[in-house]
Amino acid sequence: ISLGTTVAYIDDSGKFSRFNEMANIAREGEPNVVNQSQVVPTLLPKDIDLLTNSRENNLVIMGRTNSDTVQGFRYLNVGDKRQQSAWFKWKFNNPLLYHFIINDEYYFLDTDNFLQSIRLVQQESDPSITQDNVEFLLHIDNYTTDTGSSSYSASTKLTTFTGVSWLPLVTSPNYDLVVIDTNTASARVGRYGKPTLTSSTSFTLPGDWSGVTLTIGYLYEYSVAFPTFYLSRQQGEANRADVNSSLVLHRIKLHFGKIGLYETTLTRIGKTDYTEVYESTELDEYQVSDAPYLEEFIKTVPVYEKNTNVDITLKSSHPAPSTLRALSWEGDYSPKYYKRV
């Protein structure tokens, strides 16, 4: 495939596949070949047979037929230099049959013969809540605003939704169905609830949800596993990490953009995992009619562990945004006064 000024291909000769990129291709001389998957040597499985890319979005997605997981490579070029690149993976509800990218949308066909799409750029029709001239995107799958007719019962304190004709068309849902109040004039904009299915086309929600603009869809999990932290220094155009030093992490600081509800998990050697759930807004800091989201926020997470003894994971299974922009850490560093030769 062509990435613009370079060409990329899959090398399937080993136990795991490799994603190579060729540059400086000319009639005379050999091109420069770089193994872009060297930083994730076990990420790409063998026998990859589905490959698609979007040069406009600097994105390559690859996968295997009858597999429910695809791997992605995102890159950023400025001029003739590669400034940044990253690997990620997506897991679908059903195995994949075919996929392609067109008009800034990633389309994939699963084993249910259901053609679905993921938008690579923001569209005007994407579900969101606008507050104080700031737009907060809602992160749900298979979303819609057509929930049929609803009625509230004061005796049962339940709102019943009927005539939800699309509900039985969603096959093999792996996550929870949620309903979100997206009416900015509502007294409780941003609230969400998990309904109870009463039939194939109806469900109930606790509380009064009648007469407001609602968005309904399925939750999905967002997870970021951070690598081991080392003190690094820039030497020329490269950064060198001091892996022989002693570093005790005291705390990390998560620099968020638009943020709602999220959680962190510390996986420590010899200790039980520690999970903490955070809400971005603080008490007595916002009105009851405001959505509980912030435009930007810096959260300090205490660690107090040696850098090689802890793995840190950021997760969010909430419809609110969780935009991580940067991360910094503080700790006790010692070079151990080794003499290097």
Regions found by a protein language model. Name each.
Residues I1-V341:
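Beta-sheet repeat architectures centered on beta-propellers
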